[in-house]
A protein has these predicted regions:
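Class I S-adenosyl-L-methionine
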Residues: 1-164
């Protein structure tokens, strides 16, 4: 079993300055929920200049949740969301494996609790339409690090891994 993050994922995360340990953001609204919710944010619509993660955005673009909150945190919030959006656009297969590890980590840290994930907190990505290929080294790392045994292989989408 691998003790360290697989090399290809470590390199990918380093290149885009993202980490599976920091994929989920915080949201004052979800913090009020009775169920612990992990929101996943990207830079909405076409603001990244690289990819439009909200292809159907209309009027909601101006009132997007992304612009809510304390303006003092906007610079950092924008930077993180931009990095994640660019990383997704560059290689969504490695991004999905990174997101997979982030979900595994949250499940591990909150064992025995009911938790939820909001993958489209500030995007409209159709996660259910993205094929997910879980490599053996990432599956082994998840089992070693988080005790979550999921078979490597091709899945219809990342949701299938956790819902089947």
């Amino acid at each position: 079993m691998p003790l360290h993050l697989p090399h290809k994922l470590k390199t990918y995360q380093k290149n885009y300055n993202i980490s599976y340990t920091e994929m989920f953001g915080i949201n004052p609204k979800t913090e009020k929920n009775q169920i612990k919710t992990f929101p996943h944010h990207m830079l909405p619509s076409d603001l990244s200049g690289v990819i439009n993660v909200c292809p159907g955005a209309g009027n909601c673009k101006r009132t997007c949740l992304h612009f809510a909150g304390n303006p003092a945190y906007m610079k950092g919030k924008n930077a993180k969301r931009l990095r994640q959006t660019i990383a997704f656009a560059a290689d969504n297969s490695l991004y999905l494996e990174t997101l997979f590890l982030a979900i595994c980590r949250a499940i591990y840290k909150h064992q025995g609790e009911t938790i939820a994930f909001r993958l489209n907190a500030t995007s409209d990505i159709m996660w259910e339409n993205l094929t997910f290929n879980l490599s053996p080294d990432v599956a082994d790392f998840a089992q070693y690090k988080f005790g979550i045994k999921i078979s490597a292989g091709k899945y219809d989408n990342i949701l299938q891994v956790f819902l089947d």
